[in-house]
Amino acid sequence: MITRAELLDMLASNAPQGFEAQALGLVPIVVETSGRGERSYDIYSRLLKERLVFMVGEVNDQTANLVVAQLLFLESENPDKDISLYINSPGGSVSAGMAIYDTMQFIKPDVSTLCMGLAASMGAFLLASGAKGKRFALPNSRVMIHQPLGGARGQASDIEIQAREILYLKERLNNLLAQHTGQDVERIARDTDRDNFMSSEDAKAYGLIDQVLLKRP
């Protein structure tokens, strides 16, 4: 049977550098040495020990399940210490995003949010939902807000039901975004009518974040 090391060597000799990790879905391993010997962690598990949670990629049920589980675990570890949620996401499912949002508000620790790269749609909503005064973005990140998207097929009555649900979600999200940004609901409704992209400084002025971070404090 081929070993993991042999497989990586084969890939390295036939593919560009770094490709093997992407192709196999591998995650870097961190080795820590103590008086009791060595212990290895995947990089995300090691960062979880520092209370760092990553939400990267599409917001879907799988993403929500992982983020919620980590938030609940960190609360059980220490209910009084802040959690940092790093966001680089184009958005996705409203229901999955609301599962993360409700958990952020439910748990005892403050959840600090930080945008790296892009926080769009539900990603931007969750960015703004962090603890007041603890919402950040890196200088070249982008933020985008818009109204929820949806579509329906079938009988006219079924389409009407789906349309009512989308309108309800739009109103609910606008009210929550107004609460977190300090903007009035009418402005939120206007500004989310179409894709609305912002720089990190624009997002700060709008109230989506509290500070643009150039360097770690």
Swiss-Prot record:
It is found in: Cytoplasm. Pfam families: CLP_protease. Transmembrane segments: none annotated. The keyword Protease applies. Keywords: Cytoplasm, Hydrolase, Protease, Serine protease. Gene3D superfamilies: 2-enoyl-CoA Hydratase, Chain A, domain 1 (3.90.226.10). SUPFAM superfamilies: ClpP/crotonase. It comes from the Bacteria. Cleaves peptides in various proteins in a process that requires ATP hydrolysis. Has a chymotrypsin-like activity. Plays a major role in the degradation of misfolded proteins. PANTHER family: ATP-DEPENDENT CLP PROTEASE PROTEOLYTIC SUBUNIT (PTHR10381:SF70). This is ATP-dependent Clp protease proteolytic subunit. The gene is clpP.
